[in-house]
Structure formats: structure tokens, C-alpha cells
Amino acid sequence: MAIYGIGTDIAQVSRVAAVLERTGGRFAEKVLGPDELRVFHARRARSEARGIAFLATRFSAKEAFSKAIGLGMHWPMTWRALQTLNHPSGEPYVVASGELADWLAARGITARVTVSDERDYAVSFVVAETDAAPAPAAAPVSRTSS
């Protein structure tokens, strides 16, 4: 496997909470996929803070993933097309759907994700890998002095 790209993102939890409040909860429905949304509602029912932290980590993971694959938030990368879920062990993993899944499969791209949160911030890091032959390394930039 070769590294296709890397991405990282940090989200301020209070900003995510403010957007969620301002939109009457629609922000979560816009950003989270169906499985993520179920987890968000369950966590938020137990603890408002944990629900908001979950939303912030998933928002951050989607941003980091979009950077790792080099698309940003442009088609076929959409908010709901990528979900970050957890194995029973707690290890996070990504699941793509629809045209994003097709786009990734055509390029042999898989990804590894990690998320973390503290009171004020949520951070994510994504390494996208491919089984395709790596592109040639860029030639070093030479500098001349005048």
C-alpha cells in the first residue's frame, strides 16, 4: 500500500454546538450519515456534552478525509457519503457510500482514521492509502542565489 494522501482537521466544540443550536438540530442531519445520526441521538440523550463532542469529531473526520483524498468538500465527497463508525473495541473506521464509494474503489483507496476530543476541541487525522502504483516523486526544487 502507498499513501494516497493525508488530512487533519480540528473543530472547536463550542462552534459546532452553536451551529447545532442555531439550526434547530438540522446541522446534525445535514452532516451525519444514518448510522452516525443514530449514535449521535443516543449519546446526546445520555449527555448533551457527549453528543456534541461526537458531532464535532465526525465533522472533523469528514473534513480530514476530504483533504486526504484531495477533493475537499466537492462531489463525490459529500457530508453524508462518509461515515466514521466504531468497532466494538472503540477503534474508529470509515464507511463510504454511493458515488463516493465507487470513486474510492476505482482508485483502490482505503483510509485509516483517528479522532479525539477534549472539552474545547475535536481533532481527526486520516491516512488514505491506495493499492495503485505510487506516482513518481516530485523533483526537488532547486534554489539559486543571486
Curated annotation (Swiss-Prot):
Keyword annotations: Cytoplasm, Fatty acid biosynthesis, Fatty acid metabolism, Lipid biosynthesis, Lipid metabolism, Magnesium, Metal-binding, Transferase
HAMAP family in alphabetical order: AcpS
Family assignment from sequence similarity: Belongs to the P-Pant transferase superfamily. AcpS family.
EC number: 2.7.8.7
UniProt cross-references to Pfam families, sorted A to Z: ACPS (PF01648)
Main location: cytoplasm
Record organism: Burkholderia orbicola (strain MC0-3)
Record-given protein name: Holo-[acyl-carrier-protein] synthase
GO cellular component, as recorded: cytoplasm
Cofactor(s) required for function per UniProt: Mg(2+)
InterPro entries recorded: 4-PPantetheinyl_Trfase_dom (IPR008278), 4-PPantetheinyl_Trfase_dom_sf (IPR037143), ACPS (IPR002582), Ppantetheine-prot_Trfase_dom (IPR004568)
Function field: Transfers the 4'-phosphopantetheine moiety from coenzyme A to a Ser of acyl-carrier-protein.
Top-rank EC class of the record's enzyme: transferase
A single MF term (Gene Ontology): holo-[acyl-carrier-protein] synthase activity
